[in-house]
Curated annotation (Swiss-Prot):
Entry keyword set: Cytoplasm, Magnesium, Metal-binding, Nucleotidyltransferase, RNA-binding, Transferase
Catalytic reactions of this protein: RNA(n+1) + phosphate = RNA(n) + a ribonucleoside 5'-diphosphate
InterPro entries according to UniProt: ExoRNase_PH_dom1, ExoRNase_PH_dom2, ExoRNase_PH_dom2_sf, KH_dom, KH_dom_type_1, KH_dom_type_1_sf, NA-bd_OB-fold, PNPase
Protein name from the UniProt record: Polyribonucleotide nucleotidyltransferase
Pfam short name (any one): RNase_PH
HAMAP family documented for this protein: PNPase
Lineage per the UniProt record: Bacteria, Bacillati, Mycoplasmatota, Mollicutes, Acholeplasmatales
Family: Belongs to the polyribonucleotide nucleotidyltransferase family.
Enzyme Commission number(s): 2.7.7.8
Functional description taken from the UniProt entry: Involved in mRNA degradation. Catalyzes the phosphorolysis of single-stranded polyribonucleotides processively in the 3'- to 5'-direction.
Subcellular location: Cytoplasm
GO molecular function: 3'-5'-RNA exonuclease activity; magnesium ion binding; polyribonucleotide nucleotidyltransferase activity; RNA binding
């Protein structure tokens, strides 16, 4: 493909798209330029047919340190495994694209977004969504609807598209929206207790900009787009599916009705076994005209296919029943939340713990408090920073009664932990008010849907139990949607369980306090939803959230005044930055003495003069702070001090003119003798004395008079 360049013209901040220059073994690759940010997107797909019952799409987002003119800080000085930020960004892009592929398409696709140049004032994920969509759109892959994403902030009473870093710092709203010309397909947001109304306004505002980016992509497609590949449907499989549905449709519909009306869930397994047994009898016949025999592997694949056909038919009948009858499999009403149970203080040694159970979903949240020096160090394209609040989400296989591998956290675990972390963060106290690093681990002990929102609830209660002065309690809820694509009839479900999530069309997670929303995430399995549906889901979620908060407040309504006896005690105080060297001393001599003399107390000193002192005993902390304050205090005229003689002042002839008395490393003054002496009979070096400050000149030099010698 020849090099071609396109540029958005009707947008305030223009994107430039270059096609046909880079990565020419890929067809196509797209280079996006926006405000010094450059992202290369490549798309490759396999012609091999797969028997997957899902779309094997892999999206990778990677940042190169050279993009910001930096050398990696790792030992090897090169990029390593994906960071949490890269994983979360990959998930964002994936969630924006996946709903728009035809359900029948099953060929493997890999989309890679590489950040080659980075402007810290612009979110590279926005360029990556645009590049990924455009790359797929102009390829022969059956991807027909362009998608685009924008970031929205709220600055000085107005919404701002793709704000810079400074604007984001001052915004109560951080919203990323992806959508097509017609609908929104993905939302990711965190906020400082923002109302549902503001969120909805921001989404509408974002969608107007998204439409323009989608139209731009369509214009590019008309000029350079390839002919789309036809989806090669297996005629034999289609025939088998049609025959299967005709044979079992009515029985499956009756079975679904029995599950809903009479709670006959055992009938499902009996019916399924009956179908598989019948299929097994036919498994040796491969053709009609000539009898041949399946080998063992073919028999296995055939039975798996029949099982998948049954599950597909059953799921569709379940969906139809829920939409038509407005009923749920577990007999709840559409807005009803599952049974709730919560406890705190389950574990004696950790600094705080809480167990939150909602139906068959259960999260155990455990809090650990530490010094700020134990904060997580993040080194990325925007520079090095510290993260004092960490929430880690673990989903072991036993949570769903399975056997599985224990390995590094999965993308899903990282994503769920990040969502819960963002939900809690706005309610945490400021660093100066609560100078601790905080780590929360959520162990999912049972799971039947909405475990990330159970994590939010358990974390909120565990922090209060640990004595962390959380401003308000935070709860979360997951909302679902079932929509008939032919009639547009739909139902919205509150607090979805696993089955409803699996066969439904939407997973909308909303967390917040009684004052507003703090985190939001929406994923779809359909090509988008209207503003009306979104509005209904938001306010239905609010009702459920407040119900859950009411329950949580019965367990613990406010943070404890006292922390656990096993939690470290940290206090912070401020000194002048120029006094830091007096606390540290030459080669760390003084600070090491302070630590040694105060039972190994931990001391962290920041460049701005803040000092954090930590120990398990509060009295030890106070003694260390008092010692440091005395150490760096400034001298005052007429004040009396305990000191020691540190050295003498001599003239050129060697006569002793006076002696220097040191009170602390920052206070040293001169005791002047009435007349010069060859030999001093008043004091000796090392003598302990009591002195009075009588003068401090304009250069800060101190004069003492000797009161007495000890």
């Amino acid at each position: 493909m020849l090099k071609q360049v396109f540029e958005t013209t009707d947008l305030k901040n223009s994107f430039q798209v270059e096609i046909g220059t880079y990565a020419r073994n890929v067809d196509p690759s797209v280079l996006i330029r926006f405000q010094d940010t450059v992202v290369l997107t490549t798309t490759v797909f396999s012609n091999k047919k797969n028997n997957f019952d899902f779309l094997p799409l892999t999206v990778i987002y990677q940042e190169k340190f050279y993009a910001a003119g930096k050398i990696p800080g790792s030992f090897l000085r090169r990029e390593g495994r994906s960071t949490d930020h890269e994983i979360l960004s990959s998930r964002l892009i994936d969630r924006s694209l996946r709903p728009l592929f035809p359900k029948e398409f099953r060929q493997e696709i890999q989309v890679i977004n590489t950040v080659l140049s980075s402007n810290p004032d612009f979110k590279s994920e926005i360029a990556s969504i645009l590049g990924s969509s455009l790359s797929l759109l102009i390829s022969e892959i059956p991807f027909f609807e362009p998608v685009a994403g924008v970031y929205v902030a709220y600055i000085q009473n107005q919404f701002v598209i793709n704000p810079n870093a400074q604007q984001l710092t001052n915004s109560p709203l951080h919203l990323l929206v992806a959508g097509t010309k017609k609908n929104v397909v993905m939302i990711e947001a965190h906020a400082s207790e923002v109302s549902e109304e503001m969120f909805l306004e921001a989404i509408v505002f974002a969608h107007e900009y998204i439409k323009k980016l989608c139209l731009f992509q369509e214009d590019v497609q008309k000029k350079v787009g390839q002919t789309k590949k036809l989806i090669d449907l297996d005629a034999e499989l289609q025939s088998l599916e049609k025959e299967f549905n005709e044979q079992y449709h009515e029985q499956t519909r009756t079975l679904v009705a029995n599950v809903f009306e009479q709670d006959q869930k055992n009938d499902l397994q009996v019916f399924k076994k009956k179908i598989l047994a019948k299929a097994q009898q036919k498994a040796f016949v491969k053709t009609i005209d000539q009898i041949t025999f399946f080998d063992v592997e073919e028999q296995k694949n055939y039975l798996l296919l029949i099982e998948n056909l049954f599950q597909k038919l059953f799921n569709q009948e379940m969906r139809n029943y829920i939409i038509k009858n407005k009923k749920r499999p577990d007999k709840r009403t559409l807005e009803e939340v599952r049974n709730l149970d919560s406890q705190i203080d389950l574990l004696p040694r950790p600094h705080g713990s809480a167990l939150f159970t909602r139906g068959q979903t259960q999260s155990l949240a455990v809090v650990t408090l530490g010094t700020l020096s134990e904060s997580k160090i993040i080194d990325d394209l925007s520079g090095e920073s510290n993260k004092r609040f960490m929430l880690h989400y673990n989903f072991p296989p036993f949570a769903v009664g399975s056997i599985g591998r224990y390995a590094a956290p999965s993308r899903r675990e990282i994503g769920h932990g990040n969502l819960a972390e963002k939900a809690i963060l706005p309610l945490l106290p400021e660093e100066n008010d609560f100078p601790y690093a905080i780590r929360v681990v959520s162990e999912i002990l049972e799971s039947n849907g909405s475990s990330s929102q159970a994590t939010v609830c358990a974390t909120s209660m565990s922090l209060m139990a640990a004595g962390v002065p959380l401003k308000r309690a935070v709860s979360g809820i997951a909302m679902g949607l079932f929509m008939d694509s032919k009639t547009n009839e739909y139902v919205i479900l509150s607090d979805i369980q696993g089955l409803e999530d699996h066969i439904g069309d939407m997973d909308l997670k909303i967390a917040g306090s009684d004052k507003g929303i703090t985190a939001l995430q929406m994923d779809l399995k359909i090509e988008g939803i209207s503003q009306a549906i979104l509005k209904q889901a938001f306010f239905q979620a609010k009702k459920g959230r407040l119900h859950i908060l009411e329950h949580m407040n019965k367990t613990i309504a406010s943070p404890r005044k006292e922390m656990s006896q096993y939690a470290p005690k940290v206090q912070m105080f401020q000194i002048k930055p120029e006094k830091i060297r007096d606390v540290i001393g030459s080669a760390g001599k003084i600070i090491n003495q302070i630590i040694e003399n105060h039972d190994g107390v931990k001391i962290d000193i920041e460049q701005d003069g803040r000092i954090f002192v930590m120990h398990s005993n509060l009295e030890t902390v106070k003694q260390a702070i008092l010692f440091i304050k005395n150490l760096i205090q400034d001298a005052e005229v007429n004040s009396i001090y305990h000191a020691h003689i540190s050295r003498f002042l001599n003239d050129k002839a060697g006569n002793i003119l006076g002696a220097f008395a040191q009170v602390s490393p920052s206070i040293e003054g001169l005791i002047r003798f009435s007349k010069a002496k060859k030999e001093n009979d008043v004091v000796k070096i090392g003598d302990k004395v009591l002195v009075k400050c009588v003068k401090i000149n304009e250069r800060g030099r101190i004069d003492f008079v000797l009161i007495s010698k000890k």
